[in-house]
Design a protein with these regions (language model features):
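Acidic/His- and Gly-rich active-site-bordering loop/insert found
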Residues: 2-115, 132-136
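Acidic/histidine-rich catalytic neighborhood of metal-dependent amide-processing enzymes
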Residues: 118-136
């Protein structure tokens, strides 16, 4: 019985993610397009907060350090995700094959400053939590 519920839940999450695939990619491209070097994270933080609100997070706020805190759902279990959204600089722009803030998609991969470290995990966390909180 538990195994079936897990399979059903996994199928529902997969369906939610497939439905929102374009939104997830757009969101990732948008946050990677916002420069956030040297801990200048306010603009990208506001964009992330807006996405959380759009997805139904009941509480979205910033603490005094600039961290984005959000709450979605009201079940008995609590999940905490953590990431950083600042990046290192781009160095010499002439050394890049493309605009590092463009969010270039090629062969199924997104290339942009911060895509791997660490802005890229943020859409998965936010949409994953929204999927888990979604009613079947």
């Amino acid at each position: 019985m538990i195994r079936m519920n897990m399979q059903e839940n996994a199928a529902q999450v997969h369906q939610f993610i497939e439905f929102h695939r374009g939104d997830i990619i757009t969101f990732m491209r948008e946050i990677c397009a916002i420069p956030s070097m040297d801990s200048q994270i306010e603009a990208v933080g506001k964009r992330i907060g807006a996405e959380m609100q759009k997805l139904g997070f009941a509480e979205v706020r910033f603490d005094k350090m600039g961290n984005i805190l959000g709450q979605i759902g009201n079940g008995p279990k609590v999940l905490v995700y953590d990431s950083h959204i600042d990046t290192v600089g781009i160095g010499d722009p002439q050394q890049w094959q493309w605009d590092p803030f463009e969010g270039k998609v090629e062969n199924g991969c997104l290339y942009a400053r911060g895509a791997c470290d660490e802005k890229g995990s943020t859409p998965g966390m936010i949409y994953g939590l929204a999927a888990a909180a979604a009613k079947p």
